[in-house]
């Protein structure tokens, strides 16, 4: 059975390899200090929130999410990071994490729950197409 719970201090050793795996998947390298800062923010649970998915007591998936204001409605929930260990894929871990975030969003009174992925991430998109609706938006990033 998949167990989902908020990240806690004792989860650091299980969280970090998955966080690094997630960043590697998106071809992003970060300094160790960034992982430390992110971990502190996740554990504080004020600005960003983190979940761990466990199978047989081992952390095999993580989700990071946050709530933010929206111009025309109440707050919304954004799932920023979702990653499942390769050996645990296809076992419902990502779905369980998404559903747990959806429940947190409902409990908080959010009116929308959304996330993004790379256009070519076919494996993830196959899941997302089953459990959510693609809204057709295209994202642009402006350099700062």
Where are the regions a protein language model picked out?
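Extreme N-terminal starter segment of soluble prokaryotic enzymes
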Residues: 2-3
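Conserved active-site alpha-helix within GNAT-family acetyltransferase domains
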Residues: 95, 119-138
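Acidic/polar helix N-cap motif
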Residues: 8-11, 85, 121
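Conserved acetyl-CoA pyrophosphate-binding loop and the N-cap/start of the following alpha-helix
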Residues: 88, 92-100
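Conserved GNAT acetyl-CoA-binding A-motif
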Residues: 106-117
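Acetyl-CoA-dependent GNAT
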Residues: 6-74, 98, 104, 135, ...
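Conserved acetyl-CoA binding element of GNAT-fold acetyltransferases
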Residues: 75-86
